[in-house]
């Protein structure tokens, strides 16, 4: 099971660019399917959120090896898709995410630092 991911969050489409938003979303889904088939990522899942008064309307969580995801994140195709998404949806962003066993590691380090500093 992957212990690292990319959280790719997005807000609502820019008014008047809804069709382009659908187009770029579909391009991204095709890209992630291809990455998964090639073994470059373990899995991905897209989520649409219910309206809640906030800016985040959905996200895609891409799971995989940290080094592979770092290469993907700086690849020409990922950068191109990110630029396209940023032009048609509000609040687009990509954030690295610790998953699985890395959560335990992060909590251990955090607790050690709390003990040292308090």
How would you describe each model-predicted region?
Residues 58-88:
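Mid-chain, well-packed structural core segment of small domains
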């Amino acid at each position: 099971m992957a212990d690292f991911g990319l959280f790719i969050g997005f807000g609502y489409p820019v008014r008047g660019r809804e069709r382009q938003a659908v187009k770029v979303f579909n391009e991204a889904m095709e890209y992630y399917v291809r990455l998964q088939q090639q073994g470059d990522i373990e899995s991905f899942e897209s989520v649409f959120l219910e309206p809640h008064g906030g800016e985040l309307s959905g996200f895609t969580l891409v799971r995989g090896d940290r080094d592979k995801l770092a290469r993907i994140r700086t690849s020409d195709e990922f950068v191109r898709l990110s630029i396209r998404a940023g032009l048609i949806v509000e609040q687009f962003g990509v954030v690295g995410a610790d998953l699985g066993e890395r959560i335990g590691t992060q909590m251990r380090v955090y607790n050690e630092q709390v003990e040292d500093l308090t």
